Amino acid sequence: MTVETTEGWTLAPDIAWARIAGGQAAVMTLEAGQPLLLSASGDVIWDVLVGGRTPEDDLVADPPAPLSTTDVTVQVAEAFGLDPADVAADVHAFLEMLEAHGVLVRVRTA
């Protein structure tokens, strides 16, 4: 039996994040220590990645399950009331940017 895998994303194990005034998310790796302030649309993507958790929830919870690029794209599109095809390129670019900053890790999902 063959199990199909797809590209997915998981949070890096050494990150910290917080909500600042206005609810914006600031994320960083503990090693770099340089926070990355997310845009409003970035906040929506981040909320999908963390499963709607708060930073306080993250302190005591197991890490969120990895999500496929498709799952992230569909959930973001739903949040904005758009078709997934309309947001796919922007979502993928944002995920790759978070990966470049060490906040996300690319994985294979079943």
List where the protein language model places each region.
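Long, low-complexity, charged/polar intrinsically disordered regions in eukaryotic proteins
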Residues: M1-G33
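Long, charge-rich, low-complexity alpha-helical segments
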Residues: E31-A110
